[in-house]
């Protein structure tokens, strides 16, 4: 093994607000002691309180997302509940693609599966 995943990093215009949103979706909590000042911006992470999921970092960037993500997060969850929290529906589930594509409040796409892992 040459390496392992240490965490996931998301670019964000409002990194604290986006971190709080993802906490509400995933049941994560803000990681205390990880906030840093970086040119006046908050740089921090969120973590799974059960220590089962990866830590997610939020990196301040000056520009909005303009193209489709080259990489995305897949989660198991309740699509309606995530939409009610402020996600946007990008693509419906179909028999060929049994997951939904949603976007977070800053437009970052992610997939939601509602049942068993569809990729195994």
Language-model regions, residue ranges each:
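Short, small/polar residue-rich loop motifs at catalytic or cofactor-binding pockets
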Residues: 95-97
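Active-site segment of metal-dependent pyrophosphate-handling enzymes
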Residues: 42
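Glyoxalase I/VOC metalloenzyme domain signal
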Residues: 1-34, 45-93, 103-120
